[in-house]
Amino acid sequence: MGRLTQLAALVYVAVAVFACRERAQAVQSEAELKDMVHRMMPMVAQTTGLKFKREPLVLRRSRSQVRDYLIHKIDQDLPSTELAGLQSALRLFGLIPETLDLRPTLIDVLTEQVAGYYDPDSNALYIPEDVEPLQLRVVVSHELVHALQDQYVHLDSIIEQRHANDRRTAAQAILEGQAVVAQIPVLMPEQKPDTFPLGWFWQQRAAMAAQQSQMKQFASAPLWLREGLIFPYLGGADFVVWFRHKYLGRSVLDSMPQSTEQILHPERYASHDAPTELTFAAGEADTVEWEDNLGEYETRLLFQQLLGNEAEATTLATGWDGDRYQVLGAKKDVLVWYSVWDDAAAATRFAGGLQRAWAKRRAGVQTGRRAEVHQMVIDGRPVVRLVDAPADWKGWRALPTVRLSGGT
């Protein structure tokens, strides 16, 4: 999902619209838009505790220009070979249908959802011409926070981490979460997000999803894509509120969470519970076509997709401490996934759930494939390995192995 959430900053944050839309003032001309940005900057600076070092540009774009920008960013971030690898991984996990073509799906969904974006390369806010005037204050206030963030942390360096899906997703959650929390008092000065009960933003997920489900492309997208677009905003906002309570006066940008586990369980961040790193040993079993990790949040989504029960998915993914997978073979038809767990009980619970999920995934399908879920201990740590590959895959004779490092 980190690949996806690199683009999540482009997606219109609908949360604030519920409360703010009626009091927004219509803005029509580009001059009025620039004036809005200038007037909002002090408020954004105050609510974030950061000062603007420079004023961002603000420019209008047609919907076709927005689509062209999205295509450019997707192709830049995911060149064709990497896109093919990611698409194969998502298909092998069952997170997207075998027939789904990822690139046009991403382009269509994001084009439909975008209502403004900040581009670090040009230090500019871009507002589509077809955005309703009453939505502009919501869009501008959110993207202004991203412009300010870019003056303190290098946004591109955060979102361009390679093969570090979970860490990117966690970082994106901070960027989007801070923008959501910061824009609320800008739009509604009487509202104080720091007084919201912990978990309040995540509780708005159903309402946000319902609103977005009225959009054709979003409604027909896979669960992985729909939930992946929402998580950085709502999960990130809840973490930011927690952080502001816990670390009064500190900037959340100074010490980013390292995993979605830390976003989902802020106490893990406070206790410096860093994820365990898994590294595949060099071998000759097959050609590595793609490698990355899921993280706790996408592991939840995997179980939610395969078992259809969100509460059970949350339980099965809890206790995650690190994971790594490879897609192997010229046909990109082999999946090897290792995960390490906090304790043996969590590993056993996960392994049992994964066996049930995979049996359900492959039930009644004659695929000529073989799948194994195996528990083991590496360096004293409980580990679970999933292998799903053609039955005649040569790598079955000598499966890839991993080394563990770090973690707490």
Predicted regions and their residues:
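C-terminal soluble interaction/assembly domains
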Residues: 321-408
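Bacterial signal peptide processing site
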Residues: 21-23
